[in-house]
């Protein structure tokens, strides 16, 4: 235990906090704590309570900073970051691939074991996600000696957002040459080469994209979705019905070329959804695919949620709502989106 942890462990305030959590099992609002104390304090709460924790920060900058501090104190498997771009144009158009990879790793980690600290912020906590049970069932589990139809695997990879390429170089890509499937999962540092003998997996091994040489063999591999957006044909039918209803409501609000562009855009997006294309951009339609999308909180059974500087969190949430409304109004006027039906 370092000096700071020793100091905190002896404080009466910490004991009062622990007792409160024992009695009420409630969420916590923390403020007025020296910034450098948050990480060791959260570490001690986690180790004492032994339950999943979601730490809510006001923005991405503060979430990243706290995460970096926690990583210095704890095992990396016990701490995760769930980051999200904070600009409305990023949400509606395309967001950082680095942040997306971080989110996918975090979701996969939660599915595997919930008992961890996840640091997020307003934009991350409010982002709609594929329902947890659907996301859990979406991954592909491969095992040496298992029988798999290669064409079916290729189809499934496309559904999960993987892109077919000639040679795998980046996360989210796959290629097929004869009876060899190369795929770069979102949760791994290196791609995987799967060699088939007829329909049976003969070997699974990690390899280097630079040298193409094998790194090590494994008996099993899991291929998780490349995007938070995972859906079936049933959801596609729901989406098409819902988006066309909204298009009917929106069309009278614009005219001429703007209306033509709106129809072209929406019908183009319908085809993209059907063909699993541009899934990061198509994420804006998740509420039309699912009746009740989940959020990060929904991926946990009984988390302790700790809000740090709650007033700033509320302020940031209000600003985000205002920005989203302004973007929606402008996008409708310019034929870039459809109205929300309430």
Identify the function of each model-found stretch.
Residues 1-342:
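ASCE RecA-like P-loop NTPase motor cores
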């Amino acid at each position: 235990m370092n000096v700071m942890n020793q100091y905190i462990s002896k404080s009466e305030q910490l004991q009062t906090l622990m007792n409160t959590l024992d009695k009420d099992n409630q969420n916590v609002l923390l403020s007025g704590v020296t910034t450098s104390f948050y990480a060791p304090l959260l570490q001690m709460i986690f180790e004492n309570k032994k339950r999943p924790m979601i730490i809510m920060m006001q923005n991405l900058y503060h979430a990243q900073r706290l995460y970096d501090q926690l990583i210095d104190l704890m095992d990396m498997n016990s701490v995760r970051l769930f980051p999200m771009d904070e600009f409305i144009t990023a949400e509606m158009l395309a967001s950082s691939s680095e942040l997306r990879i971080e989110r996918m790793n975090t979701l996969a980690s939660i599915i595997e074991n919930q008992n961890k600290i996840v640091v997020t912020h307003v934009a991350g906590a409010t982002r709609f996600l594929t329902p947890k049970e659907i996301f859990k069932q979406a991954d592909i589990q491969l095992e040496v000696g298992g029988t798999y139809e290669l064409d079916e695997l290729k189809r499934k990879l496309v559904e999960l957002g993987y892109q077919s390429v000639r040679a795998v170089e980046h996360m989210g890509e796959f290629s097929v040459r004869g009876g060899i499937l190369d795929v770069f999962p979102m949760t791994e540092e290196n791609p995987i080469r799967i060699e088939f003998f007829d329909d049976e997996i003969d070997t699974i091994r990690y390899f280097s994209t630079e040298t193409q040489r094998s790194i090590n063999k494994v008996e099993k591999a899991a291929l998780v979705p490349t995007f938070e957006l995972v859906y079936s044909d049933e959801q596609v039918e729901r989406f098409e019905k819902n988006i066309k209803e909204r298009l009917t409501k929106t069309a009278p609000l614009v005219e001429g070329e703007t209306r033509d562009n709106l129809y072209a855009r929406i019908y183009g997006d319908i085809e993209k959804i059907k063909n699993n294309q541009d899934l990061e951009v198509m994420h804006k339609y998740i509420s039309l695919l699912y009746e009740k999308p989940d959020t990060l909180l929904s991926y946990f059974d009984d988390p302790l949620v700790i809000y740090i500087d709650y007033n700033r969190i509320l302020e940031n949430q209000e600003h985000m709502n205002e920005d989203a409304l302004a973007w929606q109004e402008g996008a409708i006027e310019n034929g870039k989106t459809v109205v929300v039906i309430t």
